[in-house]
Amino acid sequence: QLASEGYEQNAVVYRCVNELANAASRVQLDLFRGGQEIEDHPLLDLLHNPSPNYGQVEFFQAVYAYLLISGNSYILQNGPDNSVPYELYPLRPDRIRIVPSKIGMLPEAYQYVMSGQVRNTYLVDKKTGSSEVKHIKLFNPLDDFYGLSPIMAASMDIDQHNLSNKHNVALLQNGA
């Protein structure tokens, strides 16, 4: 609903999210070790070309836009276990369900859900917290697992703006 009413139907929110995501996605990526810049590294190669579907800019635009719209961004890492992945994919936050653990603050798993069906389950290592899915979230004082979207915090103002626009359009259509 936030994506629809806040992002798709509100030009101000759409512009804000896109401006921030576009600017952040164009930040130059540099890698350093001990104060020395490293110019050739598999991680840099991966970030410059995350997958066949996404270039660097498109990948980071999606990551940042999802974070701003939902308060959560999920990145799927494809590759051999305990090694540098060879592909990265941003996952739609509305399709991710976090399975809370019975004890502790780490989730048990991340589930990828489409049309109400769990398509994939990505387990979380109980000792290290590592998973094929990397979860980036904004602070949420009321939820241990999901981030709080800036759009949610502004939802009343966004609703008011949308309703005012609908009212003004109705007046114009009725010749007022």
Q: What is the predicted function of each stretch?
A:
Residues 1-176:
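Structured, contiguous alpha/beta core segments that scaffold functional sites
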